[in-house]
Amino acid sequence: MGHLKLKSIEVDSTVKKLGDPLKFNLRFVCFEEIKCGVEFVVLYNMDVHSDENDQVLAEIEVAPIPKGKIEFSIDADAPDVNKIPLDEMFGLTSILIVGRYKGQQFIRIGYIVDVGYPGIPSTKLMKSDVEEPSEEIGDKEEEDEEDVEEELGSEEGSEESSCIVEDKDEDNEEAEPRTFMEAVEDVGNEGKERLFESEGREEEEDEKVGSDSYSEVNRELNKSVGEEAEGSDGGEDVVDYCGFRIDKKQIEMKLMDPPVINLFEIEWEEESPSEEVPRNNNESPAKKQKVE
């Protein structure tokens, strides 16, 4: 058993603007005092299959950690929407919270995130709809996803638990564990029902009345936004995409709660005072968060 056990994690709001900051409240039980503390990093992951374009939203160190129950918060910045291409903006993505002890990853918390726009079904804005890939390409993507899953499984051989959802009831072991990739695929396969329920209803109406109705609704929804943008210098926030007028400040995201949680076995060894290396006076201190 590790030194730290996650009891619960909460996000301040599961539905918000993509440009709004986030706050996570975490509760742990610490079985042995951790003097050197642990580090947490919050990442906005644009592609569940790659971390190449991840954005770091927060990076903190919590130290020291006393034995017993502890609780702390992580304040994370909003992702920079200007660094996200529009054809990769909408649909399913993820926010990750990674915990490390002396560089060793011991916990990985993944929130599946659905990014959409008010009044427009996400499927109308997603990259797959724009490119209309052939069946052969779709089959190839499914094979690639399976290959990625197998690779992740082999790399994470030391994983203690492939998926543990928020530990609210320790006796409830009926649900089958899922990997983060499986959770994303489940949401995608059921969605195409998107997490925005209102969007799903509008998508059904679209099949009856045609896409022109969406354009009309979208123009009405964004009329004041568009007029305001034309009369100001903030035109960069309003763009035309897939036949719709998109205001980047109005883009929404919804976090699926509870998150998918992966635990990893690591070596929890505290250095003795004689083995500790003194900090160089010229080194800038790491950002720490006090635990009360």
From Swiss-Prot:
Protein name, entry field: Histone chaperone ASF1
- Renumbered residue ranges of the record's region Disordered: 123-239, 267-292
This protein's encoding gene = ASF1
Subunit structure, as described in the record: Interacts with histone H3 and histone H4.
Gene Ontology terms: cellular component: chromatin; nucleus
Bias-annotated ranges (Basic and acidic residues):
189-199, 217-226
Organism in which the protein naturally occurs: Encephalitozoon cuniculi (strain GB-M1)
What the record says about family reads: Belongs to the ASF1 family.
Q: Which UniProt keywords apply?
A: Chaperone, Chromatin regulator, Nucleus, Transcription, Transcription regulation
Q: Does the keyword Transcription regulation apply?
A: yes
Query: Per the record's keyword annotation, is Nucleus included, yes or no?
Result: yes
| Residue stretches spanning the membrane | none
Tell me which Gene Ontology terms the entry assigns under biological process.
Answer: DNA replication-dependent chromatin assembly; nucleosome assembly; nucleosome disassembly
Q: Which domain of life does this protein belong to?
A: Eukaryota
Any idea which GO molecular function terms this record carries?
A: histone binding
